Amino acid sequence: MTKKLDPPTAPSSDEDDVETSEDDSSSSEEDEPIKSLPATTAAAPAKSTAVSAATPAKSTSVSAAAPSKSTAVSAAADSDSGSESETDSDSESTDPPKSGSGKTIASKKKDDPSSSTATLALPAVKSGAKRAASEAATTSTKRVKKDEESVKKPALFQRLWSDDDEISMLQGMIDYHADTGKSPSADTNAFYEFQKKSISFEVSKSQFSDKVRSLRKKYRAKEGKDEPRFVKAHDKKAFELSKFIWGPKGIALDSNAKSNGVSKKSASKTKEKLDSVKQDLAFVGVSSTNGDDWFEKSSLARMIAGSGIDEYYVRQKWSSFTLETKKIVEEKFQLMQAKELEAMLDKSVRLTDLTSYFVDASKN
């Protein structure tokens, strides 16, 4: 016999609504993007309450189903992020319902965007720190290299002679004259050996001579001025020392300085001495009462005898001359000797001038 089967009982409307609500909520969870704004979460319970008031039966069933869904979603969120708690997931269980649905929808809690942003930004921060550290190291290395180069490279146009060196040079010229009684220009090599240890650096002979000429030229530039002005006290002190050296009564020799220490000033003194000698000779010749003494003591007899005449004969004839003749001869020879001395002096002065030209040429 064929047994009739009872038709399946139709589900109640409440069950249909619950299933429909579950399907809608599941589809909304798949379709909607995850939202976790606090304002939306806070507004969700109020809207859910309003929907529940409109449909009590549905609200009850949905409320019963929503926690389970929310709990599952919270568990999934905890497993993914590892940073959210069950309390936070339960409190944010629902999202605002779709417009026109009239049903509360349980939404899946969205991951915290701040934690995701922090996780993504962390490598960038580390990269920036490494870059800043590398740039700082590079800058420090460049600065060290630059400092080393600045130390290695000597400064251009570096001044060798300091103010103290100039004063020491001028004072050394005065001290050299006081110790030796000679002018520093008389023997430049001796003065160089005397003074070079007082200079702050190892000075060469050419540098030494150039500095002496430079100081003398600097003094000459201010010498002709009535009231020379000085910017620094050093310039004034150097001028006073230079005046003592190259001034009108200075100890050093000017461009006419001679290698043997004789200057025109000393030559004029020599000339004065010669004039006095000439006067003495003239006085002796005029006042001489016995011309034989002068002739006998002179070399004239030997000079005449040297030309081939007997010396005894010359002396004998000289004694036969009258006194007036002897005086005339004596005066003439004395004048001749004075002229010879003047010629010798003039020759000495000219040789001295010529020597000074050679000295100046050797310094250049």
Curated annotation (Swiss-Prot):
One of its GO terms (molecular function) is transcription cis-regulatory region binding. It comes from the Eukaryota. The lineage of its organism: Eukaryota, Viridiplantae, Streptophyta, Embryophyta, Tracheophyta. It holds the Pfam family GeBP-like_C. Residues 1-149 are annotated as: Disordered. Keywords: Transcription, Transcription regulation. Belongs to the GeBP family. This is Probable transcription factor At4g00390. Residues 39-80 have a biased composition (Low complexity). Residues 13-32, 81-93 have a biased composition (Acidic residues). PANTHER family: BNAANNG10740D PROTEIN-RELATED (PTHR31662), DNA-BINDING STOREKEEPER PROTEIN TRANSCRIPTIONAL REGULATOR-LIKE PROTEIN-RELATED (PTHR31662:SF68). It comes from Arabidopsis thaliana (Mouse-ear cress). InterPro entries: GEBP, GeBP-like_C, GeBP-like_DBD. GO terms for cellular component: nucleolus. GO terms for biological process: regulation of DNA-templated transcription. Disulfide bonds: none annotated.
